[in-house]
């Protein structure tokens, strides 16, 4: 056969390093057992371990279970790390550091880490920055990368040494498939002939850590089943049937007894189930849930869903949809823009509050948009989200949005510090660099996962219903579009439709007098872009993105 694999497994050495008692063990892949090699110094830390085992020409990946741990371990490692670089590498790292400083914030830990060839790789980083970090690692300019599970999720970055600091992925255990995927980063034939995997038991690791590492290494991957079969437990599937029998789409019996992700998965399954039942579609979900209901109960559920108006979306349930229809029918619309074309903060707060009521966020988004003050029962996070949302839709740059978020925390320190929707500190201390970095991380995470996902979905449903009731295919002042593109500016929106990321599109628009020729129109745009000037402009993202867009849409450019 002429077929060949780009990557092939090579020699992997696996070690267990217990920083509590200093024990170092090697794993024998054939006997499926650990062999004690000796004891390390009592002063051994993760930082000194990484430095001790890796040569100057080797690259390291350190896996951490949480965003907080990832950032803190990267900062700790940087304190005693002084690598040597070529002049070309120094220039590349300094340029990347400067761009992160300008695009995000001067006090962001990543700004100084990058200069030392260290980075952290987390999902909320802007796509352009994340891509450049990945490229710098592939080019051996970045030597050590601290990461969360984003590395498991499709990012192809091989390394020489992998340090696993926890058996968890967030609050859940790392499953065997994900673990094998993770250690597969080490030992690829086009990168190195062998690699080392170090499973590290940190001083603060729980007592299960060593046993869990052993289980992940020794035992084979169990037979896999579809997520719709395995994600929900039996009692949760029974709760879905019970809820639907009583038209209880809120799943009241489980609302406060499940995690946010489990509750959301229950809702999705329930909504798919009733849509498939309505359409007589014997899907896998229907087959699964029918196991927990009698034929008579299925008939009752079918009778119930005949009484409710069907929704085409599985993002909102029938009770939410009814509230939405009534809200739009009452004359609701998106608030008007300000005279300068930007979005008003108070209008955003008011509109989000209205949506929170009709969409029942306190029930369906209890950890984020619907987080409720225990004393007042108000949606206490709405002002925080509105502070970010109105600037995002108005086209503010990330650095400006982050600066505003930091100011918000300084004004309302009692709102505390949050990481991944969990409160980690009760008060914000403006003099604490860690607190500022947590706010930066929370802001970027809010944009990525709340604004661009949750809010965008709810705005899309509102816009769809508004167009339906008003007989429009499109309409001006569509906030769903403003959220999707992060601006109200028509030129910036067009540039993003053609392939530029938001920051590059904003840069081009802000320099339109030099970079855009409005005297020439085409079938696809009321302007053309000046290719040569774009390729030589100071903005790195614009220079990187332009060649690919030119290949795909050459008629958008002139050579000038």
What are these regions (language model features)?
Residues 1-77, 119:
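Conserved interdomain linker/interface between the two RecA-like ATPase lobes of SF2 helicase motors
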Residues 84-112:
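Short mixed-charge
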Residues 130-135, 145-160, 182-193:
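SF2 helicase motor core recognition
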